Amino acid sequence: MMIDKILKECSSPFYLYDEEKIKDKISFLNNLDLQFQRKFNFAVKANPNLAILNLIHRSGFGAEVVSAGELFKSLKAGFEPSDIIFDGPGKTEFDLKYAICLLYTSPSPRDKR
């Protein structure tokens, strides 16, 4: 069995995800999405694994982030700035400046200062 092989090859703890199950859950939510005409956003804090974020991005979801690190991961996974919601309490000055530089769009570079 594939899991037995993985267990023998890995000497440290690891997470094992079932991509098909994740896709099934995403498909279910996307069907609700169409029914209620809403777009889902994935809370990156729930699972910042880049492979999972890539899968979620390719499925049409947006990303909800609360820190510069989560924002970085979301952008690296392919989310467009317009598909990222940056909210939550306790943002540091660095988090805010980072988000402004990466998410704020303006025809004038002077506006970002």
Region annotations inferred by a language model:
Residues 1-103:
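A charged N-terminal "starter" segment
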Residues 104-113:
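Single conserved hydrophobic/aromatic residue that forms the stacking wall/gate
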